[in-house]
Regions:
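Feature 926 captures the class I aminoacyl-tRNA synthetase adenylation module centered on the KMSKS loop
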Residues: 1-149
Length: 149
């Protein structure tokens, strides 16, 4: 389940969604927004390494020691913080990204090709800049899900 989360959810959906904000090469995001994305990626890397340490001891030791100059095997195992975020769920993001990627593929386009317009439910409003940057959306509106390639 951890491998599936890292590979299929975290990498495929979260990292793809925030990488434009983390790099901020086109200056679409404020410094605070960009720093927030990088901090979250850093936090996730640290905790994913701790979760993987029992099954990949040598690799996680090497990476963790290189980044933090500590032995990961003496660090505390991460705890669930119990916080939930209302609004957009992981399933919502996965469904939206998959629908966009499928629409582009069906039209013979690459994932980095522009999307002429996208209409999404209002709950995605806080992610507007990330969606536009990640999917190269020309026009984003709110309502029922409609994808125009």
């Amino acid at each position: 389940r951890l491998k599936h989360f890292i590979w299929e959810t975290f990498s495929s959906h979260y990292v793809e969604l925030v990488k434009a904000r983390a790099y901020n090469s086109e200056n679409r995001f404020t410094k605070e927004e960009s720093d927030g994305a990088r901090w979250t990626l850093y936090y996730c890397l640290e905790n994913l390494l701790k979760l993987l340490a029992p099954v990949l001891p040598m690799m996680t030791y090497y990476i963790y020691h290189h980044l933090w100059k500590k032995d990961i095997h003496f660090e505390k195992f991460p705890n669930v913080n119990g916080k939930t975020i209302k609004g957009v769920t992981t399933e919502d993001i996965t469904m939206l990204n998959s629908a966009i990627w499928r629409a582009k593929k069906d039209k013979g386009l690459g994932l980095r090709d522009d999307l002429s317009s996208l209409e999404v439910p209002l709950k995605f409003k806080p992610m507007e800049k990330d969606l536009v940057a990640a999917h190269r959306i020309k026009t984003l509106t709110y309502g029922e899900l409609t994808i125009s390639v």
